[in-house]
Amino acid sequence: MIRSKRKINKLRGSRSNGGGCTKKRRGAGNKGGRGNAGASKQHWTWTAKFDPDHYGKHGFKRPQKMIKKVNPVNLSYLEEQADNLIESGKASKDGDSIVIDVTELGYDKVLAKGKITKSFIISAPQFSASAIEKIEEMGGEAIEL
């Protein structure tokens, strides 16, 4: 049977809209709880349909001890700080070249950013390919530890 008016439209303005006493529709208790309450109980059908991955573990988290954070330094920084490093005893001069051990400064890798005008003998655990190229271009040496 086709209804000419929907029930809600018929009940407009009637204070309780077909819910009986007004007190009966108050609060979250009549809605089955607030928010996601009852997701595994009275609202399970909704959870199963619209949020099936809500329960259980998903994915994989790499152990933090397996992740090694690389602390890089640029050639431009070493160029700028060369004189200061020699004064403080963290670097030394060997003829025309400046000898630097990057691990003493707390770095793990040498990157090639910036131009260098001096000859360096740098020892580090890692170098970028372009850093090795720049160092050797100036007559220096890149020593991998």
From Swiss-Prot:
Specify whether Coiled coil is a keyword of the entry: no
- Could you state one GO biological process linked to this protein? translation
Q: Where is this region: Disordered?
A: 1-44
On the tree of life, the source organism's domain of life is Archaea
Q: Does the keyword NAD apply?
A: no
GO annotation, cellular component aspect = cytosolic large ribosomal subunit
Which terms does the record give in the GO molecular function aspect?
rRNA binding; structural constituent of ribosome
Q: Where is the composition biased (Basic residues)?
A: 1-13
Please provide the record's keywords in A-Z order.
Answer: Ribonucleoprotein, Ribosomal protein, RNA-binding, rRNA-binding
Task: Give TM segment ranges.
Answer: none
Q: Please give the coiled-coil regions recorded for this protein.
A: none
What the entry lists under PROSITE patterns is as follows: RIBOSOMAL_L15 (PS00475)
Q: Which HAMAP family match?
A: Ribosomal_uL15
Describe the task this protein carries out: Binds to the 23S rRNA.
Name the protein family: Belongs to the universal ribosomal protein uL15 family.
Q: Subunit structure of this entry?
A: Part of the 50S ribosomal subunit.
Please report the name of this protein according to its UniProt entry: Large ribosomal subunit protein uL15
Its gene is: rpl15
